């Protein structure tokens, strides 16, 4: 597992690139395999197109960019601004130009041998796909020489994402990462899904862990994280309002009906709360949107159907729709042809730029990342107005809000750790009494 450079010196930096973007392009190209954890609005689209163009100038071969639904159009618009026309969006695997964009869902149409570089836009979205698509992407990426992952800040304590990102880039594997830096509470290896509960960073390995992550990634929430000026990157005000809906249905606990609604503690209880309050929450949402340009972020098909019933002028995005239909609706909303959209954060919460909209209604879940990404569709650089997010939740689900607050604090801590250790060199002391510093075998 080498952690050296696999790339080359950059040959092309767009004239319109800011200094921190130029730095990111140069470092990424030199590295050849890197994860860019840049927050929303920092120009990841421009950076990715520039990376692709550099690979073409160096190799005269093709680069594939994988994107979430409806994001491909944003790449075409950005490329036009940059003066790059050797780019196309392919929906069926046919391509004639050097930079090829496709959706994750359409990857099965493409062959690895046709590409020398691959860029995963919003790579965090992989966790939302079923096993088949995830396996296809992983297998595809591992066969490509130049690999780039691009997404916003990793979820707080989502070490799974960091481990799988490292593995996809060809560095330390997920299980090797666990062995090297983590300790198991139950003294067993456990599964990937419960790492948050079963594993924790070894105290003495914490700084080394974050230094290691920084050997194969770039992370920034603001240009200043990379040593540049924040001028022009100050966000407008974000206002988050909590609307607590009283659950007036009788709740059964251990066979007894409760006069007062107990706080839901388990996933089963939370789902029961969601189900028993869905109409009241939807009614409140319609009241809050009140004819504005807005997005309703819901979680279930039932909620989506009720919202559509109560707001007939809104358009739905649902899983059963064809890819083409979803793209059509999402593009229409982005172009201002649709005023209100009903969708789910796990489906359309990543990659889309909706600065024309500054209001949203959100049904919170345990997922910090889904909420963060959903909010950042509107609250991003280029937004001219204050952004209002109305969270609607039942009185029995307040633990969800508490959990999200805790995860927000952890996200801030994760960002602090990664940026503080950005210049640390990852080394390993063989023994305490041995002053000689040795690189571990995987380097």
Q: PLM features: what roles do these ranges have?
A:
Residues 366-443:
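A conserved SF2-helicase RecA2
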Residues 31-51:
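Walker A/P-loop
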Residues 45-50, 60-81, 156-161, 300-301:
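Conserved Walker A/P-loop ATP-binding site and its immediately adjacent core
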Residues 295-297, 305-306, 312-348:
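Conserved helicase ATPase core of P-loop NTP-dependent helicases/translocases
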Residues 60-62, 81, 117, 125, ...:
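Conserved P-loop NTPase motor "coupling/switch" region that bridges the ATPase
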Residues 2-37:
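Conserved pre-motif I regulatory segment
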Residues 70-93, 171-172:
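Conserved helix-turn-beta segment of the N-terminal RecA-like "Helicase ATP-binding" lobe
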Residues 226-315, 319:
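Conserved helicase/translocase motor-coupling segment
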